[in-house]
């Protein structure tokens, strides 16, 4: 994971490879791979099925309609994702990887 962490208006976010040209940045988009099958996660329906198989459940108590949230009864972890899959980026991917070690991997798309 390369880039620069930017703190603005009380929010910290990762700006990946800020010095790369636009075409290079577009070619280096990240994808998340489900390791047991080698499948690239390409939609929320696929991701939700995988997360449910790992014990995650949809969480509807957050009140924010712009987010899809998942929780695990056996932990205090909460996964929050933008409802629009086109906004699903490496920050959200790495959050899932950290909370599900050995099941997911983030890599550059080809």
UniProtKB/Swiss-Prot annotation:
Domain of life: Eukaryota
A GO biological process held by the record: vegetative to reproductive phase transition of meristem
Note, other: Overexpression of FPF1 results in shortening of the time to flowering.
Function: Modulates the competence to flowering of apical meristems. Involved in a GA-dependent response in apical meristems during the transition to flowering.
Family recorded in the similarity comment: Belongs to the FPF1 family.
Record protein name field: Flowering-promoting factor 1
């Amino acid at each position: 994971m390369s880039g620069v962490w930017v703190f603005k208006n009380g929010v910290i976010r990762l700006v990946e490879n800020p010095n790369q040209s636009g075409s290079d940045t577009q070619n280096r988009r990240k994808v998340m791979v489900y390791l047991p099958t080698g499948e690239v996660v390409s939609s929320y329906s696929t991701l939700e099925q995988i997360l449910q198989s790992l014990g995650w459940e949809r969480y509807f108590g957050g009140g924010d309609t712009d987010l899809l949230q998942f929780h695990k009864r056996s932990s205090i972890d909460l996964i929050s994702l933008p409802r629009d899959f086109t906004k699903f980026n490496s920050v959200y991917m790495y959050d899932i990887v950290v909370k599900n070690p050995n099941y997911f991997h983030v890599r550059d798309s080809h």
